[in-house]
């Protein structure tokens, strides 16, 4: 799956009128499919990450879903578990830095201006359709950034012993 196909898949999941999948679930499914990770159609592990982790406004769900997929990917590509953790963290830090540079924040509340725990604010946000552009744009950013980061041979590869 190339970058454009991943974006098309993400739009199909996220922008579905039933609003079945949130930001974290969408990115998690797309990345699992793109990188041939187990059970790409099951986004269950990511469902509580939407809205900045259980609507708390913390880490953007697209980044949270990406973190889950990166951990799985590193675990499959790097046999040594400790090394896989180092590499996954390094890659995630780069992703977060690049995302922050492009969007000015990594926290959902800062990115959206919404307290999702407030039912009125949440409803207005959904009804406004702003999630279709703002959140979808952030999902697309994560896909694009990971495409670049994961194509770099130095990332998501074990470090050479010194």
What are these regions (language model features)?
Residues 1-18:
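Polybasic, low-complexity association/targeting segments
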Residues 89-162:
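C-terminal binding/interaction regions
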Residues 23, 60, 108:
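Short cysteine clusters
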Residues 49-68:
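Glycine/serine-rich anion-binding loops at beta->alpha junctions
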């Amino acid at each position: 799956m190339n970058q454009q196909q991943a974006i098309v898949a993400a739009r199909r999941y996220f922008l579905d009128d039933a609003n079945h999948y949130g930001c974290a679930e969408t990115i998690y499914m797309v990345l699992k499919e793109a990188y041939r990770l187990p059970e790409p159609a099951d986004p269950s592990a990511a469902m509580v990450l939407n809205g900045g982790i259980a609507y708390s406004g913390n880490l953007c769900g697209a980044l949270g879903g990406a973190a889950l997929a990166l951990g799985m990917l590193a675990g499959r590509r790097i046999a040594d578990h400790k090394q896989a953790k180092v590499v996954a963290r390094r890659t995630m830090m780069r992703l977060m830095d690049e995302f922050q540079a492009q969007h000015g924040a990594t926290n959902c509340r800062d990115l959206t201006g919404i307290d999702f725990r407030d039912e009125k604010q949440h409803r207005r946000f959904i009804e406004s359709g702003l999630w279709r552009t703002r959140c979808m744009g952030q999902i697309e950013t994560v896909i694009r950034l990971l495409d670049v980061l994961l194509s770099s041979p130095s990332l998501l590869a074990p470090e050479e012993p010194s």
